[in-house]
């Protein structure tokens, strides 16, 4: 679990104080049950210079369980990277399940695509390259996607999380879930003002804090914030 490189502050994929305890969780409950395609993609992604952007293995396991528990069928993912969380979702969905996946970088997505294809899951995925906001705006304008998504996972540009939420709340069904990743930003949300954070970490931290405050005040949703991975907040639409 490397912590060197540009993403040191936000790349550490556990908020536990003990690395040994996190390793115990991985080795006892996560890695032994990790499907072979996910293991293969995790190992491929580990060689990527930006590997710390990937979804952690324990969070992938959590997403898989969650999707099965809510019987999700129509899903969306904003922010794909090499596709580890996308693969977890595709494996958890029924054969006729669908994922609308959006990312500004097709090259990263294509790193994981051969693994997805080999697993026989590519038919579940519609990938769109480019910014997600124009796509969401068009979907809302079309009118036929209102309340049509069972589950939406967002792991993208933190400075647009609130902009995503304003749109996704219309696209997720009542009773459906939106999951926002990195909502604890490697613990920096409680860092003192004089903490030695890198410029981009401090910049995005303010947007994460703003999001957390807005979600807590949004009466249209029930929320649950969990210290899984880098923090994930689940929002269940109730109105």
UniProtKB/Swiss-Prot annotation:
Gene3D superfamilies: Vaccinia Virus protein VP39 (3.40.50.150). Pfam families: Methyltransf_3 (PF01596). It is an enzyme of class 2 (transferase). GO terms for molecular function: caffeoyl-CoA O-methyltransferase activity; metal ion binding; S-adenosylmethionine-dependent methyltransferase activity. Substrate binds at residues 13, 155, 186. CoA moiety is essential to enzymatic activity since free caffeic acid is not a substrate for the enzyme. The N-terminal amino acid sequence of the protein seems to have a particular role in the enzyme-caffeoyl-CoA interaction. PANTHER family: CAFFEOYL-COA O-METHYLTRANSFERASE 3, O-METHYLTRANSFERASE-RELATED. Methylates caffeoyl-CoA to feruloyl-CoA and 5-hydroxyferuloyl-CoA to sinapoyl-CoA. Plays a role in the synthesis of feruloylated polysaccharides. Involved in the reinforcement of the plant cell wall. Also involved in the responding to wounding or pathogen challenge by the increased formation of cell wall-bound ferulic acid polymers. This is Caffeoyl-CoA O-methyltransferase 1. It comes from Nicotiana tabacum. The gene is CCOAOMT1.
